[in-house]
Every structure is written in C-alpha cells, then in structure tokens.
Amino acid sequence: TFTDVTAEAGIYSSDIAFGLGVAVSDLNGDNLPDLYISNDFWERDYLYINKGNGKFSEELPSRVNYCSTSSMGADIADLNNDGYPEVFTTDMLPGDNYRLQTTMAFDPYHLEDAKYRANYHYQITQNCLHLNDGTANFSEVGLMCGVAATDWSWGALIFDFENDGNKDIFVSNGILKDIMSMDFHDFIADQVRIRTPGSKHRFDYLKFISNIPTEHLQNYAFSNAGNLKFSNRATSLGLSQLSYSNGAAYGDLDNDGDEDLVVNNINEKCFLYRN
C-alpha cells in the first residue's frame, strides 16, 4: 500500500515541467539517496538532496553551474573512481557540422537572461556531465570529456560495458519526426502559417506532419579510458545501427559476467546486444 507524499516531501509537481528522466544515488556521502530529475523544454532540472526525515531540499541552482536545456535521459555513477558519483544528462546538440547548421536554433541573449532571472537557471543545449567534488557540488565537464554532442539523445546509461573497471556511457539516439529541421520550418511550416488564416478549408494535420523529415541516428558508446577521457566506440563494438532509439537498459542476461544491452526503437524492432 502506497501513500502519495509528494508535496510534504518537498518534491515539485510543476505544471510546466516535462520530466523525462530520474536518477537516484547518494550524491553527498551521507548514506541517504538523493534525486536528480531531468526536465525537457524550458524548465530547468531538479536536484533533490535527501534530508533524512522524509524531506527533500531542491538545491540545483546552488550546486550545479548550469544544466542541459532539453534534458531527457539521466544517470548517476562514479566515472573517475574517486568514490563520488557524477551526473550525466542527454540533450540534442549534433555531433557534426551539417546537422548543427541545419537543425539547431539557439535563444538570443535577452531571452536567456530573462529565463535566468525567472529562476530557470543557466541552461545550455548539450549533454552535461557534472563532476562531483565529493560534497554534491558539481562542475560541468561534458565538452572537455568529449561526451557533450550526440544529437537527438534520449536514454543515458552509465555502466562498465568493457569490464575494465571504468564505467562507460551509452546514449540512445534518433527522432521519428525531426521538428528542429530548419528546412522544414523555412520552406514548409512558414508557408502553412501564411496560408492557413485565410483558408476556408479544414487543415490536414496528418498531411502536414508527413512533411516533417525523419532522422535515423547512430547510438553512442563512450569508452572510458580513465581520467575522464572518453571516445565513441559504437562502430567497433557493433552498436552503430541507425535507428529511432529511445529507452535502453542493461543487465547480464546470459550470466556470463558482463553486461548485455537492450535498446527500444520507435516503430521498429528493439535491439538486443549480447556482450
């Protein structure tokens, strides 16, 4: 039997939050599980520190210098083997210049400043890797570590898929309808917005949606070489099939001592990878 204690525990139930991920771990070494919530769109992420009395305190602005703008997946694990867990979140920054130029639009400075002053905190469109200093205060090092840009990313998994003692990062990618396509916005959506107000005919949304481009993307498998140095080994590991991947999970499915991987795909069969 369960009782809903969300409000009394200090957990937000915001009408504007698009919560897509949650990760649980003891971030500050007090033997109490803390929570990290990844929120899509304009709402910032939430970091809840467990106070040990059934209460949580949301402290992201004072502990994280900035977070992903459109956070989707999230996971927590110790990536540098210092005993303190890091936080990793996924976003939508493309990893190549072509996709960067044709799919991304960034907010102007005055809008970013307005969001910050309205308590949305500093946000950046990239995967974020928050390095823990041992007291649950974090420095964002995603770009430095080479894990910031994986395109339209969903699932985030941190686990040792190489069995070398260093935890690695798996990111699932893909978007069935690439609504960020600048060509779609400039040459199709804008024309529809111009014509629709004067039209006396019923608008065909299904036809409109069919014009949105689809984008199969490669999943990423970042090998951890130690000292927070990562490289994408998806191709050499057999994990680079183009897909519309979102959810993913790992586990030793054949009891051979290493972790296998299951990846869900939209409108396509899932992937089952034996390690």
Report residues per predicted region.
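Acidic, glycine/proline-rich Ca2+-coordinating loop motifs
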Residues: T1-N275
